[in-house]
Amino acid sequence: MSDFRQDFIRFAVEEQVLRFGEFVTKAGRPSPYFFNAGLFNHGASLLSLARFYARSISESGIAFDMLFGPAYKGIVLAGATAMMLAEQGRDVPFAFNRKEAKDHGEGGTLIGAPLKGRVLIIDDVISAGTSVRESVEIIRANGAEPAGVAIALDRMERGQGELSATQEVAQKFGLPVVAIASLDDLLGFLAGSPDLADNLTRVEAYRTQYGVR
């Protein structure tokens, strides 16, 4: 396991963004863990999160010209990651959308830099793929081209069919998807964490029932 991926899982656990217990997923599945990126809700944690995104994106090798963050969680993620990339020597523009169009002031549904060139979509997770689909439509409608999708955690579980939600997005839109960490990284972290080892069996069982390889 890459050190920064393990560091991300540890960071998410420490921030209580990644929790263990009894939860129900958006798909209605009982899950032994829950990841809520909305709990990265103070300056220091957002700074660290942006650093992880920037490294994951840089190591992916995806060619892109700007970032796009779909409302609502993607808004903060795009801005924070753009700041971190700039600090590391790569200054890229970013944009995001509103859920509702504004009919005064600057108007419209888009805020930020004009969508141009190859646009990397940045979000927290991929569930049903709705956010990605809407983002792709917005980007193409503005004459730009989606370059890929960057997310925090790939749960690696089946979506509508035998593919994971991430795999479905990659197949449907022909876009690379890069995650800071995946379920494999989570399992590796649990295996090396004696204080959390009692969760390993339950997460492995969940992977066996709902996961993809």
UniProtKB/Swiss-Prot annotation:
SUPFAM superfamilies: PRTase-like. Pathway: Pyrimidine metabolism; UMP biosynthesis via de novo pathway; UMP from orotate: step 1/2. 5-phospho-alpha-D-ribose 1-diphosphate binds at residues 26, 72-73, 98-99, 102, 104, 123-131. GO terms for cellular component: cytoplasm. Its cofactor is Mg(2+). GO terms for biological process: 'de novo' pyrimidine nucleobase biosynthetic process; 'de novo' UMP biosynthetic process; pyrimidine ribonucleoside biosynthetic process. It comes from the Bacteria. Its EC number is 2.4.2.10. Transmembrane segments: none annotated. One of its GO terms (molecular function) is orotate phosphoribosyltransferase activity. Keywords: Glycosyltransferase, Magnesium, Pyrimidine biosynthesis, Transferase. It catalyses: orotidine 5'-phosphate + diphosphate = orotate + 5-phospho-alpha-D-ribose 1-diphosphate. Orotate binds at F34, F35, S127, R155. NCBIfam families: pyrE. Belongs to the purine/pyrimidine phosphoribosyltransferase family. PyrE subfamily. Homodimer. HAMAP family: PyrE. Catalyzes the transfer of a ribosyl phosphate group from 5-phosphoribose 1-diphosphate to orotate, leading to the formation of orotidine monophosphate (OMP). This is Orotate phosphoribosyltransferase. It comes from Laribacter hongkongensis (strain HLHK9). The gene is pyrE.
